[in-house]
């Protein structure tokens, strides 16, 4: 039996022209002449026929049954089986009418009331101050209406020269800088034995490396040539004072390279220096400096790579808080400077338009869009409500109007993040189904971004590098520890600036693709995208472009932390977990006949992890639990059995991530406790380090421990604390219970090379200024000119180290000697 249908599919006001059946009976007092056909079932019976449960003919206005007794024939919905409640439709119609009237009245009120200022913004003149970097003043409505319009003479710019000394003092105290050496970090001075000329050359290298890496895609410091010259002039300057903004930018570049500052102190001192900068000529530089700090803190903290503790477990949360704070600070700077307004529409209060600042206008546009990208990107990946509506309300100049070819990659990224995904809730997108239109729109925009990268040849692959074919090509040759070591030591590739731009753009696409990928996607799998992401990070991890001449900066693993404006370590951990989960799912299917493709994929993943893990987990072979899981699931090689020769150790010298960070942490904590670290560091005798500078490039594999070694060798002992002294009575002591003493041999040519070494050290800071430091060649004087001179007769340097039953090592075996020294340091500190 067919299912009964309710309702009608035709109008009661029409007649069926193709049938003789009458659907509507003419109205009248009597229906005796009406032609009825009871063979047609009516859709709705009247109320009386329903109650009586009799057949209703549905005639209008009265059915036959109601007409017989003159009963008012009515049809309502109150007795309908599947109908809506009585009056529901009428109620909806009334609500629609009410809302329509309300909308019309609100529109009328809006048109009749005061206009919104953003809509009439360009109808009147907008003023700014006439300075190198302009300050936005608005319409100056009050001044115009009160006839007190200011003139150029009324504008007085604050001279912040008095604040410079305070800013430099804050930087010195917060970040442990050495005020006598051009405010360089004491960490670097001790690390490189006060070899100032070498340190100057090294800083020049890392400045160029910064503009090649972090500043390649996002132009944080723009124009690059201007900033390069400012930074190079800063490290070559002989003046004791300088511009704090440039100095702080240099310190951020140092932090990118050595990670030697505490992040909390760096954040606090950044806000202090910016707040104390009152010179309006530095507005644009301040804005770019804060953009640089935002980029840095978006990359999280290096403390997250240490073992979890009460101090490090909240490091990533702190980075989020600090980034939000700095974004709000720069948003205020944007409003004050009026960067969202076309400069041609701004009128200086002096009445003279300055048309000779086209270059400055370009710098303002690039800086504005750099901030807009950072703000939109951070809102996307952190789920922050959108509060920056400058681009929608005022539509400032696009970066494409500059027509600068090197800005094209940045323009492509801007169009994707700001114009396609601005205000998007990434968490909401990832929770949608594949068939949802919003999810499909997001994926279409993501694929359009990839197509643009491919169109402009900006999509980077591991296959672009010939020396990495052993990671991608399938070989029947079984991988052994010797072959693995040969492959790793042969990775001497150098990435250039276009490579870094392409890698960053590709990582933006792959990271978003990985986080929003669904399990049911047949085209892409999470493990495949994870491997592609890890391969790009492997290129950066093994990049050797900044390790020429064995300069030994920070461990190579730390170079991944602040390469992009997101936490790269979280992405790496996610990718490794995806590979591990895939291997577990493959084990569950081991009882079935596995396809040949799964076996090939397993071998590809296994080959890559065999090359990734020895570098990424170099100093965690036995302590990292996740590495042990990977070794079991992918049957990785026993990395602990790899034997490195002395030359191979030199190639893998900068992989001791944990030891390096512990040394930095110990140095920073000791400087805080002592509260006079800068004084101690400046009292080190220049001539005491002459022998170590000559063979600096032959440093220990753990060269960061020279921070402690310098203090250890030159510590001033005023009293006898139980150590062996070099007097005749103790030398003649025949007590066998005394510990073994091995004196350090002093260099015989120290005095001969004294003048040469001194001139080399002072070449960075020649005495060209009356306020500069006056270095004295007297050996009894210290580096610090303000400290009292101490005669060498009162100095007792520690020339002996007590060895507790350690083997005596000859001087010709340098590697063993360094290892023994390392043991001494470990047992001492």
From Swiss-Prot:
Recorded GO CC terms: nucleus
Biased composition (Acidic residues): 722-734
Gene3D superfamilies linked: Zn(2)-C6 fungal-type DNA-binding domain
InterPro entries: Yeast_MetPath_Reg, Zn2-C6_fun-type_DNA-bd_sf, Zn2Cys6_DnaBD
Keyword Zinc annotated: yes
GO BP terms: negative regulation of invasive growth in response to glucose limitation; positive regulation of gluconeogenesis; positive regulation of transcription by RNA polymerase II
Region Disordered, annotated ranges: 722-741
Cell inner membrane found in the keyword field: no
Domain of life: Eukaryota
Keyword terms of this UniProt record: DNA-binding, Metal-binding, Nucleus, Transcription, Transcription regulation, Zinc
Name recorded for this polypeptide: Protein SIP4
Species assigned in the record: Saccharomyces cerevisiae (strain ATCC 204508 / S288c)
């Amino acid at each position: 039996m067919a299912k009964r249908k309710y309702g009608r599919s035709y109008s009661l006001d029409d007649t069926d022209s193709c049938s003789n059946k009458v659907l509507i009976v003419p109205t009248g007092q009597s229906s005796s002449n009406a032609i009825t056909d009871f063979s047609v079932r009516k859709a709705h019976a009247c109320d009386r026929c329903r109650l009586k449960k009799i057949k209703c003919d549905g005639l209008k206005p009265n059915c036959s049954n109601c007409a017989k007794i003159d009963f008012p024939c009515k049809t309502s919905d109150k007795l309908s089986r599947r109908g809506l409640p009585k009056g529901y439709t009428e109620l909806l119609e009334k609500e629609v009418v009410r809302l329509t009237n309300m909308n019309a009245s609100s529109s009328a009120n809006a048109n009749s009331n005061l206009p919104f200022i953003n809509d009439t913004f360009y109808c009147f003149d907008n003023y700014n101050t006439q300075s190198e970097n302009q300050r936005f003043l608005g319409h100056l409505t009050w001044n115009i209406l009160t006839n007190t319009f200011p003139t150029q003479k009324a504008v007085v710019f604050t001279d912040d020269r008095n604040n410079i000394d305070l800013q430099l003092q804050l930087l010195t105290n917060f970040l442990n800088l050495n005020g006598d050496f051009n405010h360089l970090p004491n960490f670097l001075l001790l690390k490189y034995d006060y070899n100032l000329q070498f340190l100057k050359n090294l800083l020049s290298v890392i400045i160029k490396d910064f503009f090649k890496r972090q500043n390649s895609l996002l132009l944080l410091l723009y124009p690059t040539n201007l900033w390069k010259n400012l930074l190079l002039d800063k490290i070559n300057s002989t003046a004791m004072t300088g511009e704090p903004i440039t100095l702080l930018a240099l310190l951020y570049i140092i932090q990118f390279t050595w990670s030697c500052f505490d992040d909390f102190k760096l954040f606090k001192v950044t806000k202090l220096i910016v707040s104390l900068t009152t010179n309006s000529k530095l507005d644009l530089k301040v804005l770019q400096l804060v953009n640089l700090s935002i980029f840095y803190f978006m990359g999280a903290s290096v403390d997250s790579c240490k073992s979890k503790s009460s101090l490090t477990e909240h490091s990533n949360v702190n980075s989020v808080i600090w980034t939000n704070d700095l974004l709000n600070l720069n948003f205020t700077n944007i409003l004050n400077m009026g960067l969202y307004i076309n400069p041609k529409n701004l009128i200086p209060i002096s009445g003279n338009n300055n048309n000779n600042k086209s270059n400055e206008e370009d710098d303002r546009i690039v800086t504005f869009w750099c901030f807009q990208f950072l703000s939109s990107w951070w809102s996307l990946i952190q789920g922050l409500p959108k509060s920056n509506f400058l681009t929608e309300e005022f539509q400032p100049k696009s970066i494409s109007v500059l027509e600068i070819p090197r800005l094209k990659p940045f323009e492509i990224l801007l169009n994707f993040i700001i114009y396609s995904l601005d205000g998007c809730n990434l968490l909401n997108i990832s929770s949608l189904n594949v068939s949802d239109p919003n999810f499909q729109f997001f994926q279409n925009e993501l694929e359009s971004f990839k197509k643009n990268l491919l169109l402009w040849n900006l999509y980077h692959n591991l296959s672009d590098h010939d020396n990495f074919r052993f990671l991608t090509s399938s070989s029947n040759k079984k991988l052994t520890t010797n072959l693995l070591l040969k492959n790793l030591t042969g990775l001497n590739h150098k990435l250039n600036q276009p490579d870094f731009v392409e890698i960053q753009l590709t990582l933006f696409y792959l990271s978003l693709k990985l986080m929003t990928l669904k399990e049911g996607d047949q085209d892409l799998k999470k493990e495949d995208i994870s491997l592609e992401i890890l391969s790009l990070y492997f290129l950066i991890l093994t990049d050797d472009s900044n390790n020429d001449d064995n300069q030994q900066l920070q461990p190579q693993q730390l170079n991944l932390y602040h390469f992009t404006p997101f936490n790269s370590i979280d992405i790496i951990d996610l990718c490794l977990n995806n590979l591990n989960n895939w291997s577990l799912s493959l084990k569950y299917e081991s009882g079935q006949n596995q396809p040949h493709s799964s076996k090939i994929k397993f071998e590809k993943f296994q080959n890559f992890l065999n090359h990734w893990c020895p570098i990424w987990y170099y100093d965690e072979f036995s302590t990292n639990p996740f590495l042990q899981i990977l070794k079991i699931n992918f049957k990785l090689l026993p990395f602990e059995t790899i034997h490195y020769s002395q030359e191979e150790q030199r190639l893998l010298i900068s992989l001791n991530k944990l030891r390096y960070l512990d040394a930095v942490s110990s140095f920073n904590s000791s400087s805080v406790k002592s509260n006079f670290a800068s004084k101690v560091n400046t009292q080190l005798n220049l001539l005491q380090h002459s022998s170590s500078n000559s063979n600096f490039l032959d440093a220990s594999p753990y060269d960061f421990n020279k921070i402690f070694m310098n203090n250890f060798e030159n510590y001033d002992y005023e009293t006898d604390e139980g150590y062996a002294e070099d007097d005749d009575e103790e030398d003649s002591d025949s007590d066998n219970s005394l510990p073994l003493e091995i004196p350090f041999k002093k260099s015989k040519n120290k005095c001969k090379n004294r003048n040469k070494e001194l001139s080399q050290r002072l070449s960075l800071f020649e005495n060209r200024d009356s306020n500069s430091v006056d270095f004295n060649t007297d050996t009894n004087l210290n580096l610090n000119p303000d400290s009292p001179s101490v005669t060498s007769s009162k100095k007792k340097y520690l020339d002996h180290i007590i060895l507790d039953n350690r083997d005596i090592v000859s001087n010709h075996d340098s590697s063993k000697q360094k290892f023994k020294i390392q043991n001494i340091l470990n047992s001492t500190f």
